[in-house]
């Protein structure tokens, strides 16, 4: 029995991905958000999430139609500044200003965070039109946020 266990462990060390499967079983990926929705012009989506320990966060976003958007992840305090269109700080590894698609991953400390999908003029991407037109330059986005 010990010989079989030793052989199994040896194979896991040699075979790529084997230990990843073990880690996934011990620490499974947790889905925080998964949606396909519209963001109207001059509006944003606020996604608040909390992690209890350092975790790897993955954000996948795909703009399916409409203008580019801003994707920001920040603390709650910085979200308050963002809402006022004041200068704010965001987590660069989990943010992508003026984007059409993002596939981000970073390990961050425990805490409460806010991810914003922004179709306003507070970020780098600017909805077209402005005061010239009454058209709603809404954006359709598909997004998923996970923690592991």
Predicted regions: what they are:
Residues 21-29, 117-148:
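C-terminal edge strands of extracellular/lumenal beta-sandwich accessory domains
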Residues 42-48, 54-58, 101-103, 112, ...:
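Intrinsic-disorder/low-complexity, polar/charged segments enriched in Ser/Thr/Lys/Arg/Asp/Glu/Gln
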Residues 1-25:
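Secretory targeting signatures
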Residues 82-132:
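Noncatalytic accessory or regulatory domains flanking protease catalytic cores in secreted, cell-surface
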Residues 21-58:
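Solvent-exposed, flexible loop/coil segments flanking beta-strands in beta-rich domains
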Residues 27-40, 64-100, 142-147:
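Surface-exposed beta-strand/loop patches in noncatalytic accessory domains
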Residues 48-71, 113-118:
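Hydrophobic beta-strand segments within beta-rich accessory/binding domains
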Residues 40, 50-54, 64, 97-99, ...:
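Surface-exposed coil/turn segments at beta-strand junctions on protein surfaces, enriched
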